Amino acid sequence: MTQGPGGRAPPAPPAPPEPEAPTTFCALLPRMPQWKFAAPGGFLGRGPAAARAAGASGGADPQPEPAGPGGVPALAAAVLGACEPRCAAPCPLPALSRCRGAGSRGSRGGRGAAGSGDAAAAAEWIRKGSFIHKPAHGWLHPDARVLGPGVSYVVRYMGCIEVLRSMRSLDFNTRTQVTREAINRLHEAVPGVRGSWKKKAPNKALASVLGKSNLRFAGMSISIHISTDGLSLSVPATRQVIANHHMPSISFASGGDTDMTDYVAYVAKDPINQRACHILECCEGLAQSIISTVGQAFELRFKQYLHSPPKVALPPERLAGPEESAWGDEEDSLEHNYYNSIPGKEPPLGGLVDSRLALTQPCALTALDQGPSPSLRDACSLPWDVGSTGTAPPGDGYVQADARGPPDHEEHLYVNTQGLDAPEPEDSPKKDLFDMRPFEDALKLHECSVAAGVTAAPLPLEDQWPSPPTRRAPVAPTEEQLRQEPWYHGRMSRRAAERMLRADGDFLVRDSVTNPGQYVLTGMHAGQPKHLLLVDPEGVVRTKDVLFESISHLIDHHLQNGQPIVAAESELHLRGVVSREP
């Protein structure tokens, strides 16, 4: 032994730390002796992998390693779920992922490289794991059959009873009582019942939960088809579907218990019976098989949900800013926030389209919203209903001779239609491009004048030759005429027009990008851009109360007189001209 300069032996090097033994997550829990379990046999057992391993080793269960000072009873380990004593893979379920993920790492030194096996372990659980208490012998059918064609059973349909309250608002015991009370009510109502059932007094507490009964198809032998899509009840001979319940519409299922060994009851919603409890009578031992198959279908459907959960709907990325409109550009949408529009207000009758050759309004609106396409043209090419009258309701699939045709302009809603909406006198001729009455009246007048030998002074020309009704105002000016005005900017989008406004009273006139020939007045009022249509569907330039000869006449009138344009309880002053760029 070598001594140092001071005669003392050098200190021995520290011993390396002992590696920590693998510890399950169960051993990290403190003892909880106050926990008492009345029926530990009903807990979830170990996974199928451990069961097969135990069977291969002679049927004896492997003994878990003795827990350290912080051990936990074996019953508490069973509560943690269907894991082996030493968990092999994390479970993708949210409630069990943390505990099983911690136990699967084995030691602290291996936690860094454990993330690579998470995906494979999760996929393995989705394929073999279970969160429903399986029968001792496992599921009755292969997963591929329940996922694919499904499983069918022949049972006897007992009818259904309306359930007035949502099953989510009831606890588990109340749900079970609801199904038993439904069986109790239908047991004597259906003749020829063969299943064993002990008649009980009606449960008055459930009077507000159960409603009327539907005994149609009651007592018939039917087929119940079970798959991950749902449950379907049908008559085997005629293949008539009694009920078809998708898996999300099924809220509760019960059956095969000690007091209802021959019956299966489940609560589901459908368009005919709404929320109802359907009762099935089964032969001996079949009720447990049906409930087990339903549980297998539920488990596989939930695993599909875990494997591909629905996408979360994200909010729109952009919101309406100070310089952009609330509905985007005109190229993006046909709905505009014109301030002289009122919901439900229709444009005046008339236009340059023959209403007898047009379709009804719903078809026209669809064509405007989605644009012309071969499918829409085929859908709208309906035969004429010669015998139909104007009293038929609109949109009944037939063309009405007096229906209003689709306008050849943007579908805007006007408020300044008092004059055009006023009823015309009964003797006023109706506007019709193909109306031949004015010419017939003129010929009759000429023939009468010749036959009577009229020698008096000739009548004015307009009285001798009646003409069809004319417009109330001139047609809107052409593009060449508007190009001479400094406030006209030609074809421009709403956003570009709004960006050119600086102060209240600034205005310009533009041509619509979506529908050329539709002229829009864009101005600034109270810091907000406003849009006003200047030409109505009949081609008349006007405001709410005044008709004008042209757009230039309208602008000059309000600009020189300082009068605001009033519409829809708002007003727009024209003070500053926004000149177009040269």
Curated annotation (Swiss-Prot):
Highest taxon above the source species: Eukaryota
Domain SH2, first and last residues per copy: 487-578
Xref: Pfam families: PID (PF00640), SH2 (PF00017)
Region CH1: start-end pairs: 330-486
InterPro entries for the chain: CEP152/SHC-Transforming (IPR051235), PH-like_dom_sf (IPR011993), PID_Shc-like (IPR006019), PTB/PI_dom (IPR006020), SH2 (IPR000980), SH2_dom_sf (IPR036860), SHC_SH2 (IPR035676)
Changes after translation: Phosphorylated on tyrosines by the Trk receptors.
GO-annotated cellular components: cytosol; plasma membrane
Pro residues composition-biased segments: 8-20
Note: PubMed:15057824 has shown that SHC2 is poorly phosphorylated by the Trk receptors, in opposite to PubMed:12006576.
Self-association state and partner proteins as the record states: Interacts with the Trk receptors in a phosphotyrosine-dependent manner and MEGF12. Once activated, binds to GRB2.
Function: Signaling adapter that couples activated growth factor receptors to signaling pathway in neurons. Involved in the signal transduction pathways of neurotrophin-activated Trk receptors in cortical neurons.
Domain comment quoted from the record: The PID domain mediates binding to the TrkA receptor.
PANTHER family: SHC TRANSFORMING PROTEIN, SHC-TRANSFORMING PROTEIN 2
Name of the molecule in the record: SHC-transforming protein 2
